[in-house]
Amino acid sequence: MKQSGINGVKTLTLVVCAALASQAYAAVNYESANYIGSQPEGSVRFIIKYKDKSQSQQMMTNRSTTSVMNNNNITIAGFNAQFVRTMTIGAGIFAVPDLKTTKEAHLVMDTIASNPDVEYVEVDRWLRPFAAPNDPFYNDQWHYYSEYGVKADKVWDRGITGKGVTVAVVDTGIVNHPDLNANVIPGSGYDFIQEAEIAQDGDGRDSNPADAGDWHSNWACGKYPDPRYEKRNSSWHGSHVAGTIAAVTNNRIGVSGVAYDAKIVPVRVLGRCGGYNSDINEGMYWAAGGHIDGVPDNKHPAQVINMSLGGPGVCGSTEQTLINRATQLGATIIVAAGNDNIDAYGVTPASCDNILTVGATTSNGTRAYFSNHGSVVDISAPGAGITSTVDSGARYPSGPSYSLMDGTSMATPHVAGVAALVISAANSVNKEMTPAQVRDVLVRTVSSFNGTPDRRIGAGIVDADAAVNAVLDGNVVERPIDELKPQAEYRNPQIKLIRDYQMMFSEIKVNGRPGNTKFAVVKADIRHTDPSQLKLRLVSPKGYEYAVHYDNIKNKSSELITFPRDEQMNGYWRLKIVDTKRGVTGYTRGWSVAF
């Protein structure tokens, strides 16, 4: 396709509209379109990522082209579409306000994907906070000091309080509150909500991360008669989360924070009805210190990022890419599992890799009835009856207050706060910790549930005292693969088809290895047109799952996995492969496990 003589409108058509005769189809995340019926009417948008070095990608990243796009409408599969903006990863966002059904979304996605320049297309999903207000305020923070709390009080007694650590709260923003203000870095934060109607503060993206309120009227956020979309007052959700992490302590008022000397950077990504995945993930990446065009760089990059939010659907390419980049910048990302009592594998970003996914427990040490569960949940924390900082206004900010809330949203900041304590403890003895080390020590030092949970919600309850002890004792070193020498390797050479948008397992039976192991080395040889759409897990004989990170270039994986618990060696070990998008298939040429 030549560019010469193409005016603004034709250039836009070249970038978006498909060459229908082409057979080189891109990865289409059909699953991301399954839930558009639960979004506010007229809110459907698509994220389109073009292949690197393609003509379309070059035009997408060209500022003059995108400025032309912004002033023109186009048609895709008969639907009017408007260019919104270009993301930091080079993907374009397009709004299709008249689209209403999953079938229509699939038609649009197929049309886009038939362009040979397209790498993938997915819906810009709508995510929401994972909490709901409960009972009136009472000053009883059992979740810090009781048998099934996080045992933060024992760490405070040793002077470990989160000092020197920055935590980003990616949420609804934050309110003016005497129990928060001193721990919010002055002038920090940003409002990433682009749509003024969602932001409810009169404008789009700006440097003011204040929570303007997320109230909404009946059925503004979804269809009648779903009770989830009845009118609701503002939640002040981000302030409640921030208070659990780092409320000012020993000030004779209100509540305490888990890491009460840590500092908060508020990142506003949720407003009326929630927020777009694209805004949320760029806000998360910015919080870690990543650059976003048009936004001043964050002068206070966070070592810990709290994301008490989510929505239906498995982790997509866009969020996983930005999570990986944020992790590479040194941020430990803590995410809520969700509150629908379902398998969190079907929730995003809870199902992403390189994060810690958090379930919720009660004061009795049992699984909270609402907590999502499953193999992607890594750890749990108190999430029922949690008191923290909010505003007293029903719709708009009117003054400081306190409230009791339930949710995995409330459990997640407990883990984020303990992560800050762990990093602070490492700093106190001149140690540096990677995000992988922080995640490992948190999971490896958990306290026990009260009995076996009715559904799997991770290794146990986060334990600040045990985690900090592990750091101070030096028990956090990531051991290189050559220091852990497996005694034997077990192989399955079978060729197995990886079917389109399905799950497959390949088994290895281990005999003659009594005892337990703390690690395994996994090797896999997988051939696939688009390996980025695959999720790999090693499943132990006990049924615990561990992420296997896949080499997209060489189509092979060789990875050391350390376990947070002893795993028996004898029994059936399985490699689980999930194809998360439609359009292409592949196969495995065998795999092995060694310990």
Curated annotation (Swiss-Prot):
The P/Homo B domain covers 484-595
Q: Name one GO cellular component term.
A: extracellular region
Annotated signal peptide: 1-21
S-adenosyl-L-methionine as a keyword of this entry, yes or no, is no
What EC number(s) would the UniProt record show? Answer: 3.4.21.-
Record PROSITE patterns: P_HOMO_B, SUBTILASE, SUBTILASE_ASP, SUBTILASE_HIS, SUBTILASE_SER
Q: What keywords sit in the KW lines?
A: Hydrolase, Protease, Secreted, Serine protease, Signal, Zymogen
Q: Protein name, please?
A: Extracellular subtilisin-like protease
**Taxonomy-wise, where does this protein's organism fall, top ranks first?**
Bacteria, Pseudomonadati, Pseudomonadota, Gammaproteobacteria, Cardiobacteriales
